[in-house]
């Protein structure tokens, strides 16, 4: 089981994402220079579109329709996949991503350095939903449509990520944090799934013995 490449790949994604998330928070939220750079990036990007204060904009109206389309598309992919395990993995990824983002935003502190709004907005709950749907699309897309599905999923996710920055809903650090939460959740779920599958195979009876005792 320990030599399972699928398990190690998923575990590596989970670990790298977790470490990246922690480092990102410590830098862009936990330091004055990090807060300043993060806030200035948001201000400069939004200024290109004439946005000076947080505003609903077009994305405020398009957000829910885009999410509904995203959930419908994922449901179709899961139905076509016809795998109960994939459905369970998808549900776990979405729940862990959204729950993780909500808990982190509620618990993490934003030190007061006089830079931008004092309330913590790391990570972005809005982007976390799009990131979770993208992660699910990655694991359930059929090989024949994989390229098209991934282009659509990452494209919509990128548009949502850019929109919340341009409209001053979130700073770039908040957005990247949401993607890392989704990657960490997906990696953790896939790691558990790979470990469970390997353990099931090892315990499968073969000639009166489990596979672990062959020979």
Where are these regions (language model features)?
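N-terminal transmembrane-helix/juxtamembrane module of multi-pass inner/ER membrane proteins
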Residues: 1-66, 105-114
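Alpha-helical transmembrane segments of integral membrane proteins
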Residues: 8-13, 85-93, 148-152, 174-177
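Alpha-helical transmembrane spans of integral membrane proteins, capturing the lipid-embedded, hydrophobic core
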Residues: 14, 18, 90-102, 179, ...
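Transmembrane alpha-helix boundary/anchor motif
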Residues: 74, 82, 95-103, 132, ...
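Membrane-embedded catalytic cores of phosphoryl/pyrophosphoryl-handling enzymes
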Residues: 114-215
